[in-house]
Amino acid sequence: PGISTMAINNRVEDFIVNDLHSRPASKGQYDFPYVLNTSINEVVCHGMPKESEHLKSGMIVNVDITLEKEGLIADSSKMYLIGEVSPLARRLVQKTYEAMWKGIKVVRPGATLGDIGHAIQTYVEGNGYSVVREYCGHGVGREMHEDPQVLHYGIPGTGAVLKEGMVFTIEPMVNAGHAQVKELS
């Protein structure tokens, strides 16, 4: 608590560049000026770091980061609980994490993208939540966003068939209310 999301961004950039000897892949991508996305509470994804935005007890924060090393992209998104959070917030974060693992456990050659989405959707909705449909996982490799699009909802046996060597993200976004989101400026 107390640190600004911009200070976190700056520390992460320093670590990527000076310790990992890598390139922050999101900086400059789609004119994005920062190294990471910091999405707080009801912001589902793509939140921008701000000097005026300080972490406080009770917040849930998603940090999404990509970096490039030796021509390959790595992408990671993780939720953090700041201090004491409400039981509802804690449960939402826990069930989202568990839903991600439900999707990961389905991954194997011969499975389909629909199998992954169905595993996530079934778990999420079975716990009284909804899956955001406007955003999805994606392939990663030499570019930050590659095919395939990995939907976090779906019908078993549909979509692309998984093959050995495919690299993609599974990063479900889950809402406590309805699935719809609105884009903020």
Model-based region annotation:
Residues 1-185:
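Active-site neighborhoods and metal-handling regions in enzymes and metal-associated proteins
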